[in-house]
Amino acid sequence: AGRRVVLIQVTSGDRGSPDRDAAPAEVAATREAEMREAARRLGMAEVVFLRCPDGELMPDLSLREKIVRMIRTHKPDVIVTHDPFRPYALHPDHRAVGLATTDAVYPTARDPLYFPEHLRDGLEPHKTAEIWFFGPEHPDRVVDITDVFDRKIDALRAHASQVGDAEGLEERMRDRARELAEGEPFELGEAFKVVQMRR
């Protein structure tokens, strides 16, 4: 509560459909509409779509520049992103975004000689205090989501093209959140790996 949250969606998921006859542009439009609705349900201030090609992301300088531009535009204290260091089952785009975001935060967004064209656009360097990696293999922070769990499920249900009728979704998510909260003074938890960045 009291925080301004901006969601940056790097791809629009235009290839993320099991329907071989689906038009990628229609898939992307559906995914973007669902993301806007999920963000609305969570009370996010803004959603930005970078519209990079789905399934083609690499943690290269081009992607890093786009993320640095977002950091310098929105000036976040905290960034929440995919944990790129999680082994095995991880979408390659998620891994690329996590790595590019980590490199964008430090040192690139901080130092003015990286992407000097940003200065010409009025975007000043920015130091982000923390990166919170979600879904980590080895979390070091579990946050109490007991009071907001229903909102989380409601937001996930906005992604109807991906979760379908969501049969069993709430039960699976609740079981996982309960596992993560074991030993904590609350019922349901969300796990993160938190990295303090150099200031």
Language model features by range: what are they?
Residues 1-74:
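Active-site rim/loop-helix segments in enzyme catalytic domains that contact anionic ligands
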Residues 58-199:
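Metal-dependent de-N-acetylase/amidase catalytic core
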